[in-house]
From Swiss-Prot:
Disulfide bonds, paired cysteine numbers: none
Protein name: DNA-directed RNA polymerase subunit omega
Purpose of the protein: Promotes RNA polymerase assembly. Latches the N- and C-terminal regions of the beta' subunit thereby facilitating its interaction with the beta and alpha subunits.
A Pfam cross-reference name: RNA_pol_Rpb6
Signal peptide: none
InterPro entries registered for this protein in UniProt: DNA-dir_RNA_pol_omega, Pol_omega/Rpo6/RPB6, RPB6/omega-like_sf
Lineage: Bacteria, Pseudomonadati, Pseudomonadota, Betaproteobacteria, Nitrosomonadales
Complex and partners: The RNAP catalytic core consists of 2 alpha, 1 beta, 1 beta' and 1 omega subunit. When a sigma factor is associated with the core the holoenzyme is formed, which can initiate transcription.
GO biological process, one term: DNA-templated transcription
One Gene Ontology CC term in the entry: DNA-directed RNA polymerase complex
EC number: 2.7.7.6
Family that this chain belongs to: Belongs to the RNA polymerase subunit omega family.
A GO MF term: DNA-directed RNA polymerase activity
Organism per entry: Nitrosomonas europaea (strain ATCC 19718 / CIP 103999 / KCTC 2705 / NBRC 14298)
Length: 67
């Protein structure tokens, strides 16, 4: 299992507050039934969301779902 670092996620969304909010939004989507965009082995939704973000599967556009 590869470790996820904040630096990997900050390459995608440079603002750490926006990065946290984006990961939270995506984790909530996964927890209510959205299909993960990566292979996950019994990971928690927030871990899945952070891995997806580090792999550039989504970006700041997810924040538009809040507006």
């Amino acid at each position: 299992m590869a470790r996820i670092t904040v630096e990997d996620c900050l390459e995608v969304i440079p603002n750490r507050f926006d990065m946290t909010l984006a990961a939270t939004v995506r984790a909530r989507q996964v927890s209510v039934g959205s299909t993960p965009m990566i292979d996950s082995e019994r990971d928690k939704p927030i871990v899945i969301a952070l891995r997806e973000l580090a792999q550039k599967k989504y970006g700041e556009e997810i924040l538009n779902t809040l507006r």
